[in-house]
């Protein structure tokens, strides 16, 4: 076996390993109405980035472009676990993204919404969904769509006088909860593992 052949095999193996490592946890955070609010998502994105999560904040109006980007990067092996986070209208459109991804059988490992309103049900490709809202305010509880086998939590913050629709996404306490959820998810799960298990039942 020649040294040149061995070197070629080693190079291919190295490229394969680099491609595997390139699959990263991706978090996309969607601002509320027209992108004028939801400044707290910038801070949450920084906190997620500090945990090693590739995070970016976008305006909710461009959610269809976000779907295209996710499908492209996932096909290229760049996305492992996928996290969608949205505030207000951004929460609604985070769910819209999940529905669009369901068509292509792409799982969403974690969906977090802050006080969405008038939203669609959570689709079956979502593994874990957390909704922070205030009963009697603008936000509403999330409901599961047909075929949903993930875990859905609606957390009512109506009794917290320090939280409103306009600052809920900036709460340090809620950020800490989201960060803990992300950390636990990355330690215990592979991308979409729970979703695949649910489909086998």
Question: What is each stretch, according to the model?
Answer:
Residues 7-16:
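Bacterial N-terminal signal peptides
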